[in-house]
Amino acid sequence: MNFIGLTSLVKRLPFYADDVKQNIKELFSKELEGLAIRQMYGIALAAGYYLKNEQMLNCIRAEAKIHLEEADATAAKFAVVVTSMTSTYHNFNSSVTDEEIKALPADLHLSAFSDPSILKTDFELYCLAISIFLKCKYCTDLHIKSLISQGVSKAAINNVARIVSVLRAAKAALEIENIRSYEFIARGPNF
């Protein structure tokens, strides 16, 4: 299989993001341990939707189209929305000290988890990616346990975190470059 390696994204990154460029090239130049190419690009697409950076999302989307079906793209969107909801609730619940409130049921609809057009493992991988962004310990642990029970390796789970970390850094670099400001010029003490 010919890997493009998100080259259009790498080309947009500034020189001070060389580590990020190198990591993107390495992550998307070959199949990562425990993840199919489709899953790698699905994770990247879910991350792109979550990060909401149009430049990055367009770069990811252009290459993801080669590896994904429309159902995969929809699953990535579902993952962002559902995980945003559940992570917010579980972060709230874990921060509450009142035991009566903690004991109340969430009663949140989660129909995306039962959608037959979405492969359960892929959807869980996408949800894990978003849980990592949202720093929801409860959701992250829940998705990891579910993925392990489905036969996903710990190396694959670690690779999800690697993809998410690198794409968040890429977004930061792109946003710095889009800030309208004058270049930083150091001046001597006598200026």
What positions do the PLM features span?
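Short, thiol/selenol-centered motifs that function as redox-active sites or metal-ligating centers
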Residues: 43-59, 126-142
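Basic- and aromatic-enriched surface patches that contact anionic nucleotides/nucleic acids
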Residues: 123
